Amino acid sequence: MYVEKINQPTDVKNLNSEQLHILADEMRQALLQKLSKHGGHFGPNLGMVEATIALHYVFNSPTDKIVYDVSHQSYPHKMLTGRKDAFLYEDKYDDVSGYSNPDESDHDFFTIGHTSTSVSLACGLAKGRDLKGDSENIIAVIGDGSLSGGEALEGLDFASELNSNLIIVVNDNDMSIAENHGGLYKNLKQLRDTDGKSECNLFKSMGLDYVFVKDGNDIDSLITAFEQVKDSTYPVVVHICTQKGKGYKIAEENKENWHYCGPFNLETGKSDMSQDGGEDYSSMTADILLKKMKEDKTVVGITSATPTVFGFTEDKRKEAGSQFVDVGIAEETAVALASGIAKSGGKPVYGVYSTFIQRTYDQLSQDLCINNSPATILVYWASVYGMNDVTHLGIYDIPMMSNIPNLVYLAPTTKEEYLAMLDWSIEQNDHPVAIRVPISVVSDGKKVTKDFSKLNEYEVTQNGSKIAIVALGSFYSVGAKTAEIIENKTDVKPTLINPIYITGTDDKLLEQLKANHDVVITVEDGILDGGFGEKIARFYGNSDVKVLNYGLKKEFLDRYNPEEIVKANRLTPEQIAEDVCGIIG
């Protein structure tokens, strides 16, 4: 096998055309084997095999620098840059991450996982090169809907002013995670339909040179195009048309479902993951919103290219019709759009992953909260038990969002609480509201009668003395278990509190606790610095009450075992109880 002999990109240059095509087939088969057993980004990588081979055949990495946008399509790149074993041998599958990583190889220049950044990063590399008087090629590879992100357009706008070498490979597979949206993609389609000859050309209008490759999965055509632009002295776009999921028919016919995959049966395409048929907050939310949409034409769902985060599959998007909006990979626009809709009397609900909400801090503060627009934001996978790649952590949202004035950030502990919060948020007109959606569905069957408009009123779920445990959201269960252990060990019955509100303190209740409590414990599923617990600690700062904050320390975690991280931060009920028992004797 040729792929087994590729230890560095120079090995690719020694192959002839026929051998390069065989190499592509071998790489694709290796990817299929690994992805079927291990999971990962499927469609983007199968579509980029030939382009990656051509890039390394023509250019001289790492002297020439290649920056992959998002870098979820960098698996073929890793195979050709000394990391093939992690794709050929099952016992080495975890030796590499799913994204570019400079710690793995000199051929990776940035740790990247969020979208639309490659052009700006490449512009920086090019400017740095020019300042030093060097002459290497700088290549940005961008696709899978990333052009819809504002930073990508900002980068393109700046690129034309470089007046030096910069090669931007636009990987056009006519898809984002789901289908593409926006006028930009209409222009890409027009360019595809005219073999790049349309007079209406976004890239040329921005002052960039342009090369079109009709078959972006043909190695020979790609090599010709890349040789044409190599060592160019002016920024140029190479527009290549690829097939997402190429080489696996099931994925070619179901591109959205095969953007990412878990382990699956290679013959049938069926997932190996157990389907327990239990409830999940995503599908539950979509069903509720669809019901509301039918009853109220002002209710609208908003996504920034991740519609299934809150359950809007292709069928449900069709059912929602114009009451569902996909702005593309543009979180900033999603929040500003929601603010505008709310100001016009609409009832917008924006579903977003915790890791992506950080991309729109300014819009949360300026466009939404200063204007006090009553939009609803549903924040998913905000947990140490969420995504565990360093670029996709969901543990920073509390410090970021809970300190913005006017925003009401809620943390439900049960399904019933979540549904009540969602209903209240959509129907109220006084506040922008965010809800930190738990990962696992917990149901206690209790009817929720709380009036959430009475802000910052915590709920005491168990009265006790000496010790109070304030346990936030999904970690309420940790607090409840901790209280049980403490009572069994000491005969002290702790007070247990569900704070509900992340954004404020119940000063009246906290003041009352001073009368018969010596220790107050806070438990949260996020980082401690700037988090919920520090608000409680600040309240008791000049009192005799001792406050213990439990959460995560501030660090960039990567590919971690959540149980190990929880234990390392002394976040298990047993560890917390041990600490408390040591204090009270």
PLM regions: where:
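Peripheral docking tails and interdomain loops at the edges
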Residues: 263, 271-275, 386-388, 408, ...
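A glycine-rich helix N-cap at a beta->alpha junction
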Residues: 86-96, 161-175, 369-381
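N-terminal amphipathic, basic-rich helices that act as targeting or association modules
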Residues: 1-79, 204, 215-217
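Active-site nucleophile and cofactor-binding loops and adjacent substrate-binding regions
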Residues: 40-48, 68-72, 100-120, 142-146, ...
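Non-catalytic terminal/interface segments that mediate subunit docking, oligomerization
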Residues: 65, 248-358, 363-373, 465, ...
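Glycine-rich ThDP/TPP pyrophosphate-binding loop and its adjacent helix/strand module
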Residues: 108-264, 270-278, 282-287, 407-517
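Cofactor-binding active-site loop characterized by glycine-rich and histidine/acidic residues
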Residues: 41-162, 299, 304, 313-314
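Glycine/charged-rich beta-loop-alpha catalytic/anionic-binding loops adjacent to active sites
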Residues: 29-36, 97-111, 133-139, 313-325, ...
